[in-house]
Amino acid sequence: MSTNPNAGIQPLTNSISQSASAHPELYHTTSHESVSTYQLQSQLSHSATSNLSTAANFHTRPPIANDENAQNLSTVNSSHSSELSKANLVDVEKCIQDPLLQIFPTVEDPDRFVFSIDPKSPLIAVNWPFRKKLKITCVYSYVALCSTFASSVFSVPAEAITTIFHISLTVSLLTMTVFLCGYIAGPIVWAPLSELSGRKLPLLIGMFGFGIFNISVAVAKDIQTIMMCRFFSGFFASAPLTVVAAAFADMYSNKHRGTAITIFAALVFDGPLVSPIIGGFLTKSYLGWRWTEYITSFMGFFALVIVYLFCDETYSKAIIRNKAKEYRAMSGNYFVHAKSEEEVLTVPDVAKNYLLVPMKLLFTEPIVFLITLYSSFVYAILYLLLEAYPIIFSEKRHFSMGVAELPYIGLLVGVFIGSAINISFEPWYYRRCLALGGKPDPEARLPPMMIGCFMFPAGIFWLSWSGYYSYVHWIVPTLSGLATGCGILLIFLQCLNYLIDAYLFRAASAVAANTIMRSAMAAGFPLFAVQMFHNMGVGWAGSLLGFIAVALIPMPFAFFFFGRKIREKSKMAVVL
């Protein structure tokens, strides 16, 4: 009795025919080709050469058995007319002559079975319609705003809990410090997770944990619980700060990426300035200080919902992995896989890439150290001002809680002015890059910073001495925020851009070093702010900070004129 060697694959071809009929957009066929086929690029030791068309794709490989009948089975490159590269066609029914191969398929070089997507495919985030990009940009910007909103929302209730829990003011200010310490620890987890699973999952996990731990703070019965939950709230809140900028880089080309990142940075700085205003009025009202955390948790859960419902994955490697998984399940061929699925990230890799290498860059590269020092200083001053403003407007001018925080609006407006200035420079920077053949020009990032380096100390001196004299009208120190906020935004943002362009292939490590130092300084500055402004006086305490800012003015000019020469002598910087 004879047997049909192709009988074993007939159900599979029938299944693919049904899938192709149900999902024609996933398959590419011509008028004379059957849809019950795979589009494969394959070569067998046997002489099987008939044509069929397919679209199949898959990911992990099962254990491979040795079989001499299939040692020359080679690559599968699935293809779709808009998604996949074209491949030669081979008759699937003649690919498997031995029934054992249906159970234990053998391949000589499984690494050649790589699934890929055309870079111009509409699946890739950079090719999405502008309306879709704008929607995701708004959602992710809101998520980042939630994160930084929580960092300082407890600055006003900190004074109230000193009486409730019988602690000193310095201890109560630790609630902001431990939150910012969570910013230091979080990126060590979220950055590698975003590389492995994409941008969306870290945001979902982050906002869920963020909401849970903010509720925990709201219902806490002792200061120890508040401190612990504030740390973990900061840990989960660091997810959007780690991931959102990368998601914008996924979606936008060089021409528009700078504008998107500027908007993101503005909202990151606006969060700590808006929350004390809301926190002040909530604490003063019948709702009490606990509602500052309830409101924050509700914001986090709302962010979780809208990210889940309205945001697609932007990371190209994750998109390819997901498509490979779909095609693998549809076709049953477990050889084909996405290249990124071969990557294995171990704990030593995480320690090296996100701790050791950043620290090495920080202490061996002058550019990284100086730029990080400057950006960390202005970032820390932002959180220090959260303690200085209540002294100026509440203690010296006797503004009530809530009203005393309204002068932060001056800083808010200043941040938006800085954003507008930065966006106005983007076309000029883009033309500079085009003149270099599309290569980044780090020094071209610095002109906005040259403006900010003067506005920043000017705003600090303005605030210090107009705030020192209580008879000066309150609008005068409030308007100082226009210069201070503008300077902070311009300096901080261009410092990050300069690091990314100067250390192109090590940009993640350079930014990680910047994140660690700036979060550490921001965590420490509020702890001595009150004592410094009380003991030295508002005028001289602010002047001390202003003199430090003046000493840093030459930095952007030095890097603008000599940055390329410094990079040429560096072992890690990029010179294109």
Curated annotation (Swiss-Prot):
One of its GO terms (cellular component) is endoplasmic reticulum. The chain crosses the membrane at residues 149-169, 173-193, 200-220, 231-251, 261-281, 291-311, 366-386, 401-421, 446-466, 472-492, 503-525, 542-562. InterPro entries: MFS, MFS_dom, MFS_trans_sf. Coiled coil: none annotated. The keyword Cell membrane does not apply. Keywords: Endoplasmic reticulum, Golgi apparatus, Membrane, Transmembrane, Transmembrane helix, Transport. It is found in: Endoplasmic reticulum; Golgi apparatus; Membrane. One of its GO terms (biological process) is spermidine transmembrane transport. Residues 1-40 are annotated as: Disordered. It comes from the Eukaryota. Its main location: endoplasmic reticulum. CDD domains: MFS_Tpo1_MDR_like. Residues 1-21, 28-40 have a biased composition (Polar residues). One of its GO terms (molecular function) is spermidine transmembrane transporter activity. SUPFAM superfamilies: MFS general substrate transporter (SSF103473). It is a multi-pass membrane protein. Belongs to the major facilitator superfamily. CAR1 family. PANTHER family: MAJOR FACILITATOR SUPERFAMILY, POLYAMINE TRANSPORTER 1. This is Uncharacterized transporter C569.05c. It comes from Schizosaccharomyces pombe (strain 972 / ATCC 24843) (Fission yeast). The lineage of its organism: Eukaryota, Fungi, Dikarya, Ascomycota, Taphrinomycotina.
